[in-house]
């Protein structure tokens, strides 16, 4: 691969590492901040929910801008915006201050940065190459998460939570600016349209049957991925002790990192149709294997590969079905849908346990929904063909 072709991938990879500052590093501040300020953990973490909510709102508008103007301006804004946001968190002294700063950061935070990375890849590579590159790029969030998980607790212990927020602000600004510099002054706007099929432009695409099918598949995959928040509790209820649960969660995290790369490679080699359907079937099998203790690692692999497909394969499906012209608009809308679905579905998993005393109703329902998702994908790809 030529140097000029490596730059977009390297830039997108760095953006995913940057994104992990919000998705992973912030979780280590919950204990220190709540203990120091006397906040309840549930009340305090609401600021992160607000961050996610405003991010879901903003990407529905940013996608169209990125498709027309490219992503460099948005990366630059995010570098400054969230860098200052981290600084603002360090000066918060009341819950409402955290809520305001968190909500503001969300506009150019996690969802925005992920969208920038995604569109950079889709605009810079052919459909075949984009699938392989996206698998590697998605691993950046996992690698970044592992780094921050080992570094951030020590920083907080040494400097306190206020100074640590400022240090992370500098890290965010530096990484985002490095990504911006590596990307260079490339004219990415409209490039994806040259690589993909031409689709009908405008809001009419959101009223088509194929959009409804992609919308439904995205919702089902997101609902299925919400098991990750309940996984430690689920495994504990199956009789595993804390050490075993910790090991299994770590193994699943490793499966996700490996799975995203493998999915990208398989998509490039065998095509998006077979890969997406196969992974979704494996996802359903993973849920089924949770009822068989001897197959627990097969179950974890299925769950990991399935959840990884949201970020790796679903964007390729959108490009395959809608082509390049509508990609940014459709994908930003799908991101909004998945964010809202996650926001609504996550507490439902907990409610199932509260009402039934176990997760069995959800574990039985999800393979059925994933089966429906497979049927929708087959119909979608047949219509496309």
Enumerate the predicted regions with their spans:
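Conserved MFS/SLC helix-loop-helix module at the cytosolic interface between two early adjacent transmembrane helices
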Residues: 57-95
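Extracytoplasmic gate region of multi-pass secondary transporters
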Residues: 26-30, 206-263
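Helix-to-loop junctions at the C-terminal end of transmembrane segments
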Residues: 58-70, 260-271, 353-354
């Amino acid at each position: 691969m030529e140097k000029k072709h490596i730059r977009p991938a390297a830039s997108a990879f760095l953006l995913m590492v940057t994104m992990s500052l919000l998705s992973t590093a912030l979780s280590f501040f919950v204990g220190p901040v709540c203990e120091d300020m006397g906040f309840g953990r549930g009340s305090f973490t609401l600021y992160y929910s607000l961050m996610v909510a405003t991010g879901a709102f903003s990407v529905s508008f940013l996608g169209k801008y990125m498709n027309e103007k490219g992503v460099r301006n948005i990366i630059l804004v995010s570098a400054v915006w969230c860098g200052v946001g981290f600084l603002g968190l360090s000066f918060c002294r009341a819950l409402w201050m955290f809520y305001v700063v968190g909500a503001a950061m969300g506009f150019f935070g996690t969802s925005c940065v992920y969208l920038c990375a995604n569109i950079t890849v889709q605009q810079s590579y052919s459909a075949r190459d984009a699938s392989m590159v996206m698998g590697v790029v998605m691993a950046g969030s996992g690698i970044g998460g592992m780094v921050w998980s080992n570094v951030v607790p020590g920083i907080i212990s040494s400097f306190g939570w206020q100074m640590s927020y400022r240090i992370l602000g500098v890290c965010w600004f530096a990484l985002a600016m490095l990504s911006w510099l590596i990307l260079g002054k490339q004219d990415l706007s409209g490039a994806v349209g040259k690589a993909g099929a031409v689709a009908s432009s405008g809001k009419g695409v959101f009223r088509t049957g194929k959009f409804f099918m992609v919308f439904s598949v995205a919702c089902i995959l997101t609902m299925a991925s919400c098991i990750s928040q309940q996984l430690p509790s689920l495994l504990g209820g199956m009789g595993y002790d804390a050490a075993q649960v910790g090991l299994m969660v770590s193994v699943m995290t490793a499966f996700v990192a490996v799975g995203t790369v493998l999915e990208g490679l398989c998509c490039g080699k065998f095509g998006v149709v077979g890969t997406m359907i196969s992974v979704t079937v494996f996802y359903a099998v993973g849920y089924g294997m949770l009822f068989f203790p001897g197959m627990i690692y097969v179950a974890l692999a299925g769950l990991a590969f399935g959840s990884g497909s949201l970020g790796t394969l679903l964007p390729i499906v959108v490009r395959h079905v809608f082509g390049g012209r509508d990609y940014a608009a459709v994908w930003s809308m799908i991101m909004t849908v998945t964010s809202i679905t996650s926001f609504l579905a996550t507490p439902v998993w907990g409610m199932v346990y509260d009402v039934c005393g176990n997760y069995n109703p959800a574990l039985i329902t999800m393979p059925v929904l994933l089966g429906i998702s497979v049927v929708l994908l087959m119909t979608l790809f047949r219509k496309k063909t």
